[in-house]
């Protein structure tokens, strides 16, 4: 029963991404709809676009748009190019100082003077210099353009009941893992945007609880099996690290109990997603 959670095949990863799209669309689809519909044919920059699936989901119902997606992971860009015919996809890193000069020639080719929407979904937590990156992005905004920042803050994350403290331990494991990014990024977004020169900063959404979903198992499917795969791979990559071995074995031994918790009527799980817009 446990072994089926110890790896994610390509098909399972595709399924996880579909779940992620469904969950996050439920979380803040209205924010994106309002931003996209401010202009008849919005020019959109999707920062950290990955395979492009999330943005394509958000753009459903938008008749006309111009899209450029950027990601520093070349493999993801190759997938986006093969999967989506609408839009341009580039291997670029927004944290590089020359990012604006690198993307402007492509903007000119696409007839884009400035972006009406710049989307940063789950990327600021991984930035070394968020203010610098956001400042560069601001120079690419069109007049009256909007930046959308969706990120996470584990201070908003909780699970209850948690008598065995399994979820408490899991949250601590995530917070102590530098490769997971800044797990308290969400509370800093307003300050980052202010220092980067943005105005009219608004916080639209705070926290996504399982009680707001028709099927709260979606939150389990979104996060938990993928994390187990991550901890397994980290252990396999560094087998001599006893702490990482211990983390993986604990996760492996407790994942079924965590799933059982999600299936209980009185259980609630909250993920710390946040959504800001600024101009």
How does the language model describe each region?
Residues 2-27:
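Class I SAM-dependent methyltransferase Rossmann-like catalytic core
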Residues 119:
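A conserved beta-strand element that flanks and buttresses the S-adenosyl-L-methionine
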């Amino acid at each position: 029963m446990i072994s089926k959670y110890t790896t994610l095949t390509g098909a399972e990863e595709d399924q996880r991404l579909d779940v992620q799209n469904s969950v996050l669309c439920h979380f803040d689809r209205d924010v994106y709809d309002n931003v996209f519909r401010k202009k008849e044919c919005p020019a959109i920059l999707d920062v950290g676009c990955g395979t492009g699936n999330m943005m394509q989901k958000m753009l459903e119902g938008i008749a006309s748009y111009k899209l450029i997606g950027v990601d520093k992971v070349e493999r993801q860009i190759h997938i986006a190019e093969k999967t989506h015919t609408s839009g341009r996809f580039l291997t670029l890193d927004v944290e590089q100082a020359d990012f604006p000069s690198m993307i402007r020639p492509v903007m000119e080719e696409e007839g884009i003077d400035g972006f009406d929407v710049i989307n940063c979904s789950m990327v600021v937590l991984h930035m070394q210099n968020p203010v610098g990156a956001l400042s560069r992005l601001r120079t690419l905004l069109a007049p009256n353009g909007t930046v959308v920042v969706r990120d996470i803050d584990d201070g908003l994350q909780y699970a209850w009941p948690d008598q065995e403290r399994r979820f408490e331990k899991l949250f601590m494991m995530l917070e102590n893992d530098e490769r997971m990014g800044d797990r308290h990024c969400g509370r800093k977004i307003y300050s980052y945007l202010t220092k980067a020169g943005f105005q009219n900063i608004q916080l639209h959404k705070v926290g996504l609880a399982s009680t707001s979903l028709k099927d709260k198992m979606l939150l389990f499917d979104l996060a938990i099996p993928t994390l187990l795969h991550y901890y397994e791979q980290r252990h396999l990559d560094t087998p001599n690290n006893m702490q990482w071995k211990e983390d993986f074995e604990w996760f492996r031994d407790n994942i079924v109990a965590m799933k059982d918790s999600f299936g209980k009527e009185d259980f609630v799980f909250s993920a710390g997603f946040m959504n800001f817009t600024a101009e």
